[in-house]
């Protein structure tokens, strides 16, 4: 069990002691390929800037609906996605922008989806919570808490049925471990020997309700034990630790054809969604969630600098290229056309049948 | 032609589809070792093995959702829910997921699955096991809802449902499993035909005085009513069997009402907000000028279904109550004095 960091599952304040343990030994970095490290850093920074741009576009009313950001979770997202093959499948909850990009979707089309445009990954039908792409096998961000769990198990069932060596990763938040679908899905996943890794991204807060308030067993990685599913906990601020833990479990799932559970804890830097000012947090908690020592991008950047992998010049260069690509994504989204209203009835059914309704709101039921 | 039960029509067709397509598998509670609560899956575990006949724990949300997920990767699950009442446990996966995945993601992935489940009161099963809540699913764009009433319909409609790329709620009925009817000799392997078309109603019996509309068990009761009224009262009743609740074939029953001038709807669900309400609204919009009398609905009494037999019988629509509504309607029209 990778259980060095021990969140007590409550408010950020209650688990403040983690900070003192947070400085990672940078010696491991010496054994890594510097280009691969820089790539991880670039990808994390990209999610950071992409989400900041998303937030800005939301406040400018370019993006509508609910909008949940990965700010503070960049190391978790990048670490997890580094563990998957292109052919592995991914299911997530609604906090999915970073995952979509990291699984291989074009950020331009992800931003276009946020804008609700025709070139969006789901043609503007999904929005922030519903990124989806069959090509890259990101099989959806889902808006109903726990809804993606049975689906992901079903995808793993299909993998098992066809005897291919793909693995399914199913991401969720800490609050999901209390809903019925969690229990039903973990049970059948183990019972049916499914190659799936459940990942709980624990930011200690389901909207405003803390893990302490909602989970009788706040050590979430232990919550697979009722189903004999091995669990690990990893510091979600540490991209290499997440990558290594996720890779280990994904490969074991592939090899052993059985499910695993990974809990990655980190901070949610902002409110639950863009519009949430997080008034339920004390100033101390807000400071902690945004502290530099808890910021995965800053942590990793500093580690790389200390290890002489990332120079000041390199940092600026990466920042500039990330900024440019994010701007490109926003420009692309801005210039993508709105979906044509004539397509309104195109995606209700895959197999056309007689008497499908194509009635617009004011139309009579009998058109002729 | 041969005469078989509704149960056998379902079983043989399911088996034939499993033989035809390796992607078709069945999943549900007690369908393998137990061979199905109502024996629709009898013999399948022996023939196809546990991979294609998957017994599940009592976890409707989990296994219905798993079926949806497997359908997203191209398998074609046929889920058995022991009764439609238990679909309430899985309703999030049916309505928020199965019905949404094709549209919500811009048409990238269809969900080719069938959820077979019986409705039906009249078995003294009490309040939680006697409901007819197909309305919930018929309300949802993205789902297709089929409700066969005869063995021939059961066979060809199940085949159509399995071959369709969308999620289909396939409504069976406890009271129909033992009912018999004629089917073509090659019914299990037959290719699609008109009976099977999703989205089409059928005229089960032609008549000229009044239109009687029903589906599932009530379509068979409607036929009994029509036969009885023809014999005893010389009333000619046209029976429309809806067959498909979504999409709803309004034209077929509206055309019938245009011919007869009046309509009675019989339904096994509750009247208020029920499927009959949609039919009645459609009739007034599609055949207003042809109506000689208000459209009547004969439906369950609006109570949680009681256990005691006399109470249960009183709560359910049947031949007597439907006949009464027809005679009263025709009296109002002036065609007959009931």
Language model features with spans:
Chain A
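Mixed-charge, polar/low-complexity N-terminal
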Residues: 25-26, 31, 38-39, 43, ...
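Cofactor-binding active-site loop characterized by glycine-rich and histidine/acidic residues
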Residues: 52-56, 60-192, 210-216, 221, ...
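Glycine-rich ThDP/TPP pyrophosphate-binding loop and its adjacent helix/strand module
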Residues: 138-335
């Amino acid at each position: 069990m990778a259980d060095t960091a021990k969140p007590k599952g409550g408010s950020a304040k209650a688990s403040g002691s983690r900070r003192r343990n947070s400085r990672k030994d940078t010696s491991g970095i010496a054994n890594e390929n510097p280009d691969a490290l820089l790539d991880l850093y670039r990808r994390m920074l990209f999610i950071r800037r992409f989400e900041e741009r998303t937030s800005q576009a939301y406040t400018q009313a370019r993006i509508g609906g609910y909008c949940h950001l990965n700010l503070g979770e960049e190391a978790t997202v990048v670490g997890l996605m580094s563990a998957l093959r292109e052919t592995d499948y991914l299911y997530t909850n609604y906090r999915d922008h970073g995952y979509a990009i990291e699984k291989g979707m074009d950020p331009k089309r992800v931003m276009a989806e946020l804008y609700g445009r025709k070139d969006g990954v789901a043609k503007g039908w999904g929005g922030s919570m519903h990124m989806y792409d069959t090509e890259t096998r990101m099989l959806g961000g889902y808006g109903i808490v726990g809804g993606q769990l049975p689906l992901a198990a079903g995808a793993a069932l299909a993998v098992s049925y066809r005897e291919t060596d793909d693995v399914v990763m199913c991401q969720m938040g800490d609050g999901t471990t209390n809903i019925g679908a969690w229990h039903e899905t973990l049970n059948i996943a183990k019972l049916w020997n499914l190659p799936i890794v459940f990942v709980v991204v624990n930011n200690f807060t389901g909207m405003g309700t803390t893990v302490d308030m909602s989970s009788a067993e706040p050590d979430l990685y232990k919550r697979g034990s009722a189903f004999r599913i091995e669990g690990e906990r990893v510091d979600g601020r540490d991209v290499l630790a997440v990558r290594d833990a996720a890779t280990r479990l994904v490969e074991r799932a592939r090899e052993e054809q059985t499910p695993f559970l990974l809990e990655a804890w980190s901070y949610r830097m902002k409110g639950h969604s863009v519009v949430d000012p997080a008034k339920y947090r004390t100033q101390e908690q807000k400071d902690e969630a945004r502290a530099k020592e808890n910021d995965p991008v800053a942590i990793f950047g500093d580690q790389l600098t200390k290890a002489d992998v990332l120079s000041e010049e390199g940092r600026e260069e990466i920042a500039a290229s990330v900024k440019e690509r994010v701007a490109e994504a926003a420009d692309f989204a801005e210039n993508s056309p709105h979906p044509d209203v004539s397509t309104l009835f195109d995606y209700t059914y895959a197999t056309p049948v007689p008497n499908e309704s194509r009635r617009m709101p004011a139309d009579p039921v009998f058109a002729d | 032609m041969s005469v078989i039960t509704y149960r056998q029509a379902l079983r043989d067709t399911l088996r034939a589809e499993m033989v035809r397509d390796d992607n078709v598998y069945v999943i549900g509670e007690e369908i393998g070792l137990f061979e199905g609560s109502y024996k629709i899956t009898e013999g399948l575990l022996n023939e196809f093995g546990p991979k294609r006949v998957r017994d599940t724990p009592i976890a409707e949300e989990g296994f219905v959702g798993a079926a949806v997920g497997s359908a997203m990767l191209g398998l074609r699950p046929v889920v058995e829910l022991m009764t439609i009442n238990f679909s309430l446990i899985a309703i999030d996966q049916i309505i928020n997921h199965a019905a949404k995945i094709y549209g919500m993601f811009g048409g990238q992935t269809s969900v080719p699955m069938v959820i077979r489940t019986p409705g039906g009161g009249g078995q003294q099963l009490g309040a939680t096991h006697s409901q007819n809540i197909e309305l919930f699913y018929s309300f949802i764009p993205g789902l297709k809802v089929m409700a066969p009433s005869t063995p021939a319909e059961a066979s060809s409609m199940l085949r159509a449902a399995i071959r369709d790329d969308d999620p289909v709620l396939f409504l069976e009925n406890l009271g129909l499993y033992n009912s018999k009817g004629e089917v073509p000799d090659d019914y299990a392997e037959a290719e699609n035909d008109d009976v099977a078309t999703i989205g089409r109603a059928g005229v089960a019996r032609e008549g000229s005085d009044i239109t009687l509309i029903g589906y599932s068990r009530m379509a068979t009761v409607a036929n009994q009513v029509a036969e009885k009224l023809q014999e005893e009262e010389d009333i000619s009743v046209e029976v429309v069997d809806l067959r498909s609740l979504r999409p709803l074939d309004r034209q077929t029953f509206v055309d019938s009402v245009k011919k007869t001038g009046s309509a009675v709807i019989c339904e096994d669900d509750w009247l208020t907000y029920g499927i009959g309400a949609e039919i009645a609204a459609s009739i007034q919009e599609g055949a207003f000028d042809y109506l000689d009398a208000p459209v009547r609905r004969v439906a369950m009494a609006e109570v949680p279904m009681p256990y005691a037999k006399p109470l249960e019988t009183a709560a359910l629509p049947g031949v007597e109550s439907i006949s009464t509504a027809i005679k009263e309607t025709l009296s109002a029209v002036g065609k007959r004095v009931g």
